[in-house]
Amino acid sequence: ADLSMAVRIVDNAKTSAPEAVNSIESVLVHRDRAAEFLPKMKQALDLHGVRILGCPDTCRILPGASPAAAEDWNEDFRGYTLAVRVVDSLEEACAHMESHCGGVAVGIVTNDIAAAQRFAGMADAAAVFVNASTRFLDGGEFGLGAELGVAGQKLHVRGPIGLHALTTMKYIVTGSGQIR
């Protein structure tokens, strides 16, 4: 992946509106890129005072990162805190997200088209962002007008249920480094 693009996307997705539902709460980094990427990411996030909670590998790479507790991987921080984990594979990343992601938005930064397609297919989220900030998850940005909220659940209707009410949407957004 283009590490400078990844840093820009993470910085934007966390710090442009950290209280927003489309702000990221965690970052998963492949082991092969962690030692090079994480210090660059931290340098950008330090400008905003972001606190990093990390797995043991993250804490070894980033002096000043605090150890993440088990519950931190499920936390909706809505502020300047980010949980960071080093993973060995795309499958491990997707398994982590399946256990800990709220189902609203996930993203990947990669130059590998096949990996991006596999990720988009495996990710169980309302929106999947490939090489673009999750901050684009917004009714207005998607051309849907003002939104009342963003749902991560697959079924959210009450009362009589027609076929349309049983349909869920999964948006896959592909970019080349776009931030909002």
Segments from the language model and where they lie:
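Conserved C-terminal structural/oligomerization subdomain of aldehyde/semialdehyde dehydrogenase
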Residues: 69-180
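ALDH superfamily catalytic-core signature
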Residues: 1-78, 130
